Structures are given as C-alpha cells and as structure tokens.
C-alpha cells in the first residue's frame, strides 16, 4: 500500500478542518436535550493547609456571566465545530491573544456533559495540554477562553509530510505519552486521541504539541470500566466497540497515531466507517515491506506492544515512555542548562504573600511560549519519569547536577510551599510561577493580567469582597480567610482605603523579600 494512496484516503476522511472537534460526531452516546436554564456554578472554596490559605488550581478559572465583548475583541474565525465556532480573541486591556470557543446551548445534545468537559479541563496543567483560562455564560451561549495555538493540526502535518522520520515521530510520541500518563494519573481517560485533536503551539519546528479537545473525556479510576461506545473509527480500541473498556483504550489510540506517523496511513483502513470498524474489531494489522522496510525493529516492537489486542497484555503508558525507541530517539532533547538562579527563585517564592503567589501563578499560565521557553525546557528535563509533574527528588537531583552539593536544610519545606494543592507533586504552572525571573513578569502589561483577574467588577481596585471570592467564598464566613485578607491589606493597601489599586499592586509585585 503506497503512501500517496493512503494519504488520499486520509484526506477524504477529513470532513472539516477545525480548531476544536466538538464531542459527539462519531459516538453512539445516549443523549437527551437539556433545558436552557442550566446555570454553571463555580466552586471557589479554598483549602486550608498548615494554617495557610491556598487555592485549588481549578479556582484560578472563573466563570463570568457578563458580556464577553466587554473584555475581548472577537477577531477572525479559526474553526467550525459541530455545535459552535472558535474565534481568535484579543484582550482589550492587555492585548493578549486567545482562542475563544463558542458553544450554542440549544445545539448541545448534552449540556451537562459539556460542563463535565469544563470541569476536567480546569484540573489540567501540563506542557502538552491546552490551557483553559476562564469561561463566560449567558442565556444562549457558553464561551471557553483558551490558549491560542498558532501551529497546525498534527493531522495536517501528516497530510503534508506523508510520514515522519523516526526521530521526529519519537519526539511527538513522547509528548503524547507524557500527556496520557498525566491524564491517567488524574484518573481521566481521554477516549478520542487522534491527530485532529492535537495542535502545535506555534509554527516553530521545535514547537510543543498540545491536546486541544476533551469532549469525550471522563473520570475513570484504576480498575474501573466504562461502557459507552465513543471515539473515532480509525483510532478507537476494539474493547470500546465491545462495550467494556478501561483507560488502556488511550494506549491503543496512541499506537494508531504512532503507526500513522511513521508510514502516512493508519493500520486499520477502509472506504467506509463500517469497513474500518470491522478491521479494528479484528485488531489485525501489517507492516508492509514497501513502507516499513527501513523502519527500525524497535519502532515496530513498540507499535506492536501498543496495539496488543488484549488490554491486559497491552503495554502500560510507563512502559511506552521507557521503551528503548523513545529513550534512544529523544536522548538529544534532554540536555538542558539549568540556571544557577533556580534555587534562589524557589526560595524567594516561599516568602511571598498569598496574593503575589497567585498573581505569579496567573502570569505563568498566561505567558507565551517564547517568554517561558527556557523554564519549560528545564521542567521537561527535570521530569525524569515523564509524569508531567515534579517530585521533590527530581528537583533535588536536578540541583545537584548543576553543582549544588550543599542543599539548604529547608529545601523540602520550600518545595512543599510550591505545591499549591498539597498533591505531593509540583505541577507545571506552579514550577513556572516559582522560578520566573522578575525581569519577565515586572511589566505593566504583564501585571495587568492578574490584576484584572482579581478586579472582578472592573472598577480598577481589588476589594475585600473580591479577595474573599478569590480566597474562598464571599457568602460564607471563614475566620482564617478573613485574617489572611486583613494581613494582606496591612501589607499592600498603602493608603488605607480598604482596597488595592494598580499602583499598590505593582509595588507589591516589585517588592523584594
């Protein structure tokens, strides 16, 4: 089977180019129409840990009921999905660019599932997963404000290239495996991994790959099974078609993607969806000599392990990440120079007040790829187990590599303080927030991003009520939160008016501990 013929088959299967493929296109889900009066309620409760107030990551993503147009300029359309469109959005104050996903409520088959997608996205923080920043909702529409990826779909790269070199394919697959590892560690199964659901962050040749759609994702614990037939014919696992499967369906899908990257066509193909599904159900595939003769035995071995029919015998995601093909082919990408200021920034972060820590976290989440490129590479290099999070030991080992033989005795407390949700692991954005240099964040246009987040009513000042909403809930009394806010105002509210204006906010951000 030749590449040119196979690529043409893929082209015919590509129905529409869209930035986000909305769930429901290829599923047999039992759905029902929901009423339009469902209102999404964000839970902004805080966590108390060791006498401090900390925020769950999902609480940095607020749901607004105001007019989207008051904050964003709606620019060009980026794509069309089944139930809505995706536009480029421009923040009127900061000029930051975003992708705005618009969903019309009366066209959603199951609005509760859509809110489940939002809840899942709010938990996620990984270099290879698109970021969700905030949501808007009115009577007719729901809007997701997301990270803008200016690169192309992985699908389009396959169409253009026909196939990838093993080195390039391994670089892509390592990112996909890492994202799957992270999702599964959170007990989330994706269920629709396919090249159309991956975007390159930019047009740069070394750009990160991002999963951009979570419409079919669901929470699924270890040892649990689900029965809904969901996915896309080429990439769906046989067990999904049988109606009983677990998280290993994602590993099968990754095997289909890897096969396609290396030869330009999927292992199970046909002129109709039914033909494809029949072949998937059998699970039999071949490495055709014309296309696979020059491909290494290691690559074919990994594909065979990923596409093992019996899920109990299929390789785990950890085994995929540690497979010789991945470790050998991506070795050159792992040498990153660690800055000697890394430990200094980590220690300084511990001393900051809670408002500044949250502000730095918001900044870290919003900064573009160019601004965090070095820190991102450091994070990936330190993440030895490719889990998408950092353990204390991984950071300590990294510090020793750059010559820190005498690690400060309080280092474990420093690292615990960075762990914003007490998970025992340091997440991507937490690491960026704790290590970002002042010269990067101490700019008016950058500091406006967190200030506007705190200034919910947009009057140019951060009030006590707004701080309560950020740190906890403004409708529930909490002495711990009240005490934290009083202490914060004493430090930051220099003119004593009970509010924090932007000048006071900038002074707080520039203050050296």
Curated annotation (Swiss-Prot):
Catalytic residue positions: 192
Annotated catalysed reactions: L-seryl-[protein] + ATP = O-phospho-L-seryl-[protein] + ADP + H(+); L-threonyl-[protein] + ATP = O-phospho-L-threonyl-[protein] + ADP + H(+)
Gene3D superfamilies, per database record: EF-hand, Phosphorylase Kinase, domain 1, Transferase(Phosphotransferase) domain 1
Top-level taxon: Eukaryota
Binding site for Ca(2+) 1: 383, 385, 387, 389, 394
Positions contributing to Ca(2+) 2 binding: 455, 457, 459, 461, 466
E.C. number: 2.7.11.1
Cofactor(s) annotated in UniProt: Mg(2+)
UniProt region (J domain), positions on chain: 345-380
PROSITE patterns documented for this protein: EF_HAND_1, EF_HAND_2, PROTEIN_KINASE_ATP, PROTEIN_KINASE_DOM, PROTEIN_KINASE_ST
Post-translational modification: Myristoylated; myristoylation may target it to different subcellular compartments.
UniProt entry tagged with the keyword Repeat: yes
Positions where lipid (N-myristoyl glycine) attaches: 2
Domain remark from Swiss-Prot or TrEMBL: The EF-hand domain 2 appears to lack a functional calcium binding site.
UniProt name for this protein: Calcium-dependent protein kinase 2
Taxonomic lineage of the native organism: Eukaryota, Sar, Alveolata, Apicomplexa, Aconoidasida
Gene that produces this protein: CDPK2
């Amino acid at each position: 089977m030749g590449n040119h013929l196979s690529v043409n088959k893929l082209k015919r299967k590509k129905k529409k180019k869209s930035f986000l493929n909305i769930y429901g296109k290829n599923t047999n889900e039992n759905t029902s129409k929901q009423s339009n009066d469902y209102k999404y309620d964000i839970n902004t409760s805080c966590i108390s840990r060791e006498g401090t107030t900390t925020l769950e990551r999902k609480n940095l993503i607020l749901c607004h009921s105001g007019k989207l147009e008051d904050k964003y300029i709606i620019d060009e359309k980026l794509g069309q999905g089944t139930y809505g469109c995706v536009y480029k959005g421009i923040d009127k104050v900061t000029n930051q660019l975003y992708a705005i996903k618009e969903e019309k409520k009366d066209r959603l088959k199951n609005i509760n599932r859509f809110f489940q997608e939002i809840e899942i996205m709010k938990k996620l923080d990984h270099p290879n997963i698109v970021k969700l920043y905030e949501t808007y909702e009115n009577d007719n529409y729901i809007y997701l404000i997301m990270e803008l990826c200016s690169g192309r779909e992985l699908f389009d790269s396959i169409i253009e290239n026909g196939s990838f070199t093993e080195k390039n394919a391994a670089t892509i697959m390592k990112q996909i495996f890492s994202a799957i590892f992270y999702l599964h560690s959170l007990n989330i199964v994706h269920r629709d991994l396919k090249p159309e659901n991956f975007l390159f962050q930019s047009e740069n040749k070394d750009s990160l790959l991002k999963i951009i759609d979570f419409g079919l994702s669901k929470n699924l614990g270890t040892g649990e099974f689900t029965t809904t037939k969901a996915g896309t014919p080429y990439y769906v696992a046989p067990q999904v078609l049988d109606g009983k499967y677990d998280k290993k369906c994602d590993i099968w899908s990754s095997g289909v993607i890897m096969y396609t990257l290396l030869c330009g066509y999927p292992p199970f193909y046909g002129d109709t969806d039914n033909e494809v599904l029949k072949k998937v159900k059998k699970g039999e595939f071949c490495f055709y000599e014309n296309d696979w003769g020059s491909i290494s035995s290691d690559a074919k071995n990994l594909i065979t392990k990923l596409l093992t029919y019996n899920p109990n015998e299929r390789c785990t995601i950890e085994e995929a990440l540690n497979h010789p093909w991945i470790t050998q082919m991506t070795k050159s990408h792992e040498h990153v120079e660690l800055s000697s200021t890394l430990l200094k920034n980590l220690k300084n972060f511990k001393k900051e007040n809670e408002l500044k820590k949250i502000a730095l976290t918001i900044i870290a989440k919003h900064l573009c790829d160019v601004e965090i490129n070095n820190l991102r590479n450091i994070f990936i290099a330190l993440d030895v187990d490719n889990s998408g999070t950092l353990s204390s030991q991984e950071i300590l080992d990294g510090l020793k590599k750059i010559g820190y033989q005498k690690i400060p005795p309080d280092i474990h407390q420093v690292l615990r303080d960075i762990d914003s949700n007490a998970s025992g692991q340091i997440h991507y954005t937490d690491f960026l927030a704790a290590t970002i240099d002042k010269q990067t964040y101490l700019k008016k246009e950058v500091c406006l991003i967190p200030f506007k987040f705190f200034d919910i009513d947009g009057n140019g000042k951060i009030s006590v009520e707004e701080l309560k909403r950020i740190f906890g809930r403004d409708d529930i009394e909490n002495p711990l939160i009240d005490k934290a806010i009083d202490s914060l105002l004493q430090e930051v509210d220099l003119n004593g008016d009970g509010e924090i204006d932007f000048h006071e906010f900038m002074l707080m951000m520039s203050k050296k501990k």
